Amino acid sequence: MYTYLMVIMLFCIGVVVTLTSVPMISKMLEKSDMIRANYKGDMIPVGLGLVFIPTLIINSVILIYSNIVPEKIIMIYMLLFASISMSFVGIIDDSLGNRGVTGLLGHFKALFKGTLTTGAFKALLGGFVGLTIAVTISKSIPNIIVATLVVALSTNMMNLFDLRPGRAIKVYTLLAIIIFIASAKFQREVMMLILPAVLAYFYFDLRALTMMGDAGSNVLGVSLGVFIVSSFGLA
């Protein structure tokens, strides 16, 4: 049953878990030489988007335990699957990515020449994740096509915004608020699985203390896509 208490509880837990996770994951990445120069030339840890995953999992356990409706539980698992998958491919790109190939077109040109770049791998996996989400929520071919594109393009959009500290999170938060207001009650609870982590991490990103990398921007984009297709009649 929807209650404002559940939303508040998930929000508070998400903030606490994220603030606890940031220093630990930051230190882990530093020890693994996951360090990169930011736009000012300062060397900071990259891949801090991983901090979104602990909050997502913990809050998902709570929300799944409190619900017995299969359709609602499926929605939670969709977000879990999409976010963990794209965070996984994101951290691969952050750690192994070839910066000599840029842009979606550049990655696919390399792919057509027989070279699989991490960027192309990310784009392909994003497309298949979008397709998986789409066929889960709809059996209508037109809706499946639209939903797949929404999820895939949302992921790519957040990558494009994540070029300066705080920019991607600002855009994400604005769009998430709009979706939150327009969504049904349970969708709002689902949004609380990830939104608190994003807001709690915002300070570190805005101050350029850490870089969330593709491990984070992918999660922002794909979660936004899941929220859109599950909230606006694409089933």
Where are these regions (language model features)?
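"…together with the soluble PPM/PP2C metallo-phosphatase catalytic core" -> "…together
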Residues: 2-235
